[in-house]
Amino acid sequence: DQDEGVSTEPTQVGPAELHNDETCVGPLVYRN
């Protein structure tokens, strides 16, 4: 949510989705 540098990596879904979806393989992996 606060990491803009990480949310700028749209892998499968949009940045907004990645913040809420933990199943997505992308920025979420970095934060969790």
UniProtKB/Swiss-Prot annotation:
Entry keyword Glycoprotein: yes
Keywords: Disulfide bond, Fertilization, Glycoprotein, Secreted
Disordered: annotated segments: 1-32
A GO biological process held by the record: single fertilization
The keyword Disulfide bond is annotated on this UniProt entry: yes
Glycosylation positions in this chain: T11
Cellular compartments annotated: Secreted
One GO CC term on file: extracellular region
Occurrences of domain Fibronectin type-II (ranges): 19-32
Assembly notes: Homodimer.
Described function: Could enhance the fertilizing capacity of bull spermatozoa upon interaction with heparin-like glycosaminoglycans present in the female genital tract. Exhibits both simulatory and inhibitory actions on the release of pituitary gonadotropins. Binds to heparin and gelatin.
Family (UniProt): Belongs to the seminal plasma protein family.
The protein's name in its UniProt record: Seminal plasma protein PDC-109
